[in-house]
């Protein structure tokens, strides 16, 4: 019952129970200390709760509270499939006092600039096809994979940066030659890096900024924006799986 609102939202976005299980989507209930109390009962210290990024600390360290409350939750996994952080979307569309999306802060194991959401699922197909599609959000990755675009990944609430470039180069077979200042890579030639962010002005700006980071790829780089302003999740919902190429 607590997760009913989360289920309604996700079903309305075209995701069924199988797809939610595939991506490990969950729910963090409302309340300030649900998770903190469970973790304390299992022997974790308050310092460990805060260090994990799952809990925050009040002024003066007087209170430890759940960072994620009343949110749909996505596990963020590294390339090996190990969970290193979480991303959460608020359920209420009316409460503008809290961020719509909230990610785990920087921790000993989570560095947002070094993680691409969905890479654990996409890595084999990226290496095989020499193609990667970079989208903006968690539901966009889900929609793309469910539509057969299994090379889709997303940044985790940050811009596409130098560390992301290095990750993609490695998967595509791009090899840097520092002495020459160029990128070479036989496997990457003919490969593709496609950025497809939201169709609004902010999304287009983000895509062009990401494209600017990419000018040293041996693979071809493209920016794809839907003419109607749809993101991949909206496009799949409006026009079906075949609408995402």
Per-segment meaning from a language model:
Residues 1-8:
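Conserved active-site segments centered on acidic
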Residues 13, 21, 144:
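Mid-domain, small-residue-enriched loop/turn segments at the edges of structured enzyme/sensor domains
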Residues 20-21, 25-27, 31, 224:
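Terminal amphipathic helices with adjacent charged low-complexity linkers/tails
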Residues 23-28, 65, 198-200:
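Conserved short loop/turn motifs at secondary-structure junctions
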Residues 31-189, 207:
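Phosphate-handling DNA/RNA-contact segment within nucleic-acid enzymes
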Residues 139, 157-160, 197-207, 225, ...:
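Acidic, metal-coordinating catalytic cores used for nucleic-acid/nucleotide bond scission
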Residues 184, 191-216, 221:
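Phosphate/diphosphate-binding loops
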Residues 218-245:
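C-terminal or mid-to-C-terminal helical accessory/interaction module adjacent to the motor/catalytic core
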């Amino acid at each position: 019952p607590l997760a009913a609102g989360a289920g309604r939202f996700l079903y309305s976005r075209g995701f069924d129970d199988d797809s939610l299980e595939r991506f490990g989507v969950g729910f963090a209930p409302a309340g300030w200390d649900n998770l903190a109390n469970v973790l304390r009962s299992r022997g974790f210290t308050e310092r460990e709760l805060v260090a994990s990024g799952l809990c925050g600390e009040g002024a003066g360290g007087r209170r430890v509270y759940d960072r994620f409350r009343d949110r749909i939750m996505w596990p963020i996994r590294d390339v090996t499939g190990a969970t290193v952080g979480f991303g959460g979307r608020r359920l209420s569309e009316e409460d503008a006092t809290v961020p719509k999306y909230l990610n785990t802060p920087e921790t000993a194991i989570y560095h947002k600039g070094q993680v691409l959401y969905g890479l654990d699922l996409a890595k084999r197909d990226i290496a095989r096809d020499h193609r990667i599609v970079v989208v903006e959000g968690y539901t966009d990755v889900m929609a793309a994979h469910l539509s057969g675009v299994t090379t889709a990944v997303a940044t985790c609430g940050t811009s596409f940066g130098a560390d992301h470039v290095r990750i993609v180069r490695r998967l595509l077979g791009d090899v840097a030659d520092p002495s020459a200042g160029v990128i070479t890579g036989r496997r990457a030639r003919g490969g593709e890096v496609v950025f497809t962010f939201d169709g609004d002005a902010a999304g287009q700006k983000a895509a062009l900024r990401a494209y600017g980071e990419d000018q040293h790829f041996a693979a071809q780089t493209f920016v794809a924006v839907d003419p109607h302003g749809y993101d991949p999740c909206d496009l799949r919902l409006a026009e079906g799986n075949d609408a995402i190429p």
